């Protein structure tokens, strides 16, 4: 419980006592969109199924988002009596930017009396950092690109002399990779005592 004296001190010293809520600096909502398409068909010799999808997600603060593409294809082919070939292809590609759980955690960890930005517009130094650097997309970015692909082929043969028995040959190839890119640029944060005094004009 704050006394009237404390409240007056907070109001009259905005560079010393904050009245902050980091959640106010975040966007009110994020969103995601999903698009998908699938096609299937065939005949008694060949059957196929192909699908693809795209997802876009926007986060709650500057520059945070994700784009993801995924695809799947399946082919079943009758070659000769008792011999079939199945081919499966799956994969996805993702592009994530500035994804971080610590920024949201910071929204709840800082005291509302902590000054985040001085009246001069400069960012306050909180042990050399400031959560608004991430919220406003300052200081650089982190981007993560992933690519996962799998191809699987199965050749199955039903033994004509042993009803219900079959043998198969299966091969699988995986191609997975990930690229992380980090870009940093220096940003200035200040403590209250280091804010330069406004220049005064000579009388």
Regions found by a protein language model. Give the residues of each.
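Membrane-spanning beta-strand positions in outer-membrane beta-barrel proteins
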Residues: 47-51, 78, 84-88, 164-166
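Extracellular loop and loop/strand-boundary signature of outer-membrane beta-barrel proteins
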Residues: 22-24, 57-61, 74, 136-142, ...
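Outer-membrane beta-barrel transmembrane strands
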Residues: 28-44, 53, 69, 133-182
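Small-side-chain secondary-structure face that scaffolds active or pore-lining regions
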Residues: 60-68, 90-92, 98-103, 147-148, ...
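Residues embedded in well-ordered regular secondary structure
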Residues: 1-62, 101-102
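Acidic/polar loop-and-plug regions of large Gram-negative outer-membrane beta-barrel proteins
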Residues: 7, 14-16, 97-150, 193-202
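Short secondary-structure subsegments characteristic of cysteine-rich extracellular domains
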Residues: 66-78
């Amino acid at each position: 419980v704050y006394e009237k004296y404390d409240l007056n001190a907070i109001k009259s010293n905005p560079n010393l006592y904050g009245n902050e809520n980091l959640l106010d600096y975040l966007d009110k909502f994020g969103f995601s969109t999903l698009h998908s398409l699938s096609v299937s068909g065939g005949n008694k010799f060949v059957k196929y199924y192909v699908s693809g999808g795209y997802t876009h997600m926007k986060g709650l603060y500057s520059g945070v988002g994700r784009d993801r593409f995924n695809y799947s294809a399946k082919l079943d082919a009758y070659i000769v009596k008792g011999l079939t070939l199945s081919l499966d292809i799956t994969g996805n590609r993702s592009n994530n930017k500035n994804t971080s759980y610590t920024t949201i955690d910071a929204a709840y960890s800082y005291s509302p009396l902590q000054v985040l930005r001085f009246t001069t517009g400069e960012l306050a130094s909180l042990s050399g950092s400031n959560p608004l650097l991430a919220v406003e997309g300052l200081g650089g970015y982190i981007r993560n690109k992933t690519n996962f692909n799998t191809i699987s082929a199965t050749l199955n043969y039903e033994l004509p002399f042993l009803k219900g028995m079959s043998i198969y040959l299966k091969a699988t190839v995986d191609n997975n990779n990930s690229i992380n890119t980090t870009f940093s640029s220096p940003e200035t944060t200040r403590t209250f005592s280091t804010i330069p005094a406004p220049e005064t004009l000579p009388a």
